[in-house]
Amino acid sequence: MDENFIKKEFDATKWDEIKPFAKELLERRLNCANCIETLIADASELGEHISEAGALLYIDMTCNTEDIDKKNAFLEFSTNVRPKLSEFSDKLNRKIIDHPKLDNLPERYNLIIKSIRTDIEIFRKENIPLSVRQTELVTESQSINGSMTVVFDGKERTLPEMNVYLESKNRIERAAAWKKISDRRMEDHERLTEIFEELI
């Protein structure tokens, strides 16, 4: 591909900014096998932008578990953008597979086409809300676990910071650290159990 499909900066975490690109891909006329190749390449380029944006939101959230704005930004992406992307991807996949010149594509596209066919087979629109709910629950669980702290040895510490005390050669110190961690986990045990049971 001589030039990029996306020629301007855009916020790939917002559906309103993704939508024009998605619309163009879905409505593009495909008059030749080469046109299908370009469509696949352009869709891949768009997907890379969105995947990178989503990954950065996730990293920001997990590195700042007590930052409500970062958590909400990730949840907004997961509950508003990803469901629409799922439907868009399915429509685009069917557009590609249904094209009469699909068999004229070079052999190097065989694995891509096989993957697209598999995606079409497993896609179920009714599963989208379930996936959204799963993300919400996992995010809540991560937020709860990430915000857990205890006061130990005169200082407030996160649970990962307590691991060093669990490896202490001093048996009394190890036991005290274990009890602190256990007691703190019990404070959120009920909600975490509810989340786990809903996930399974």
Residues covered by each model-derived region:
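A well-structured
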Residues: 1-200
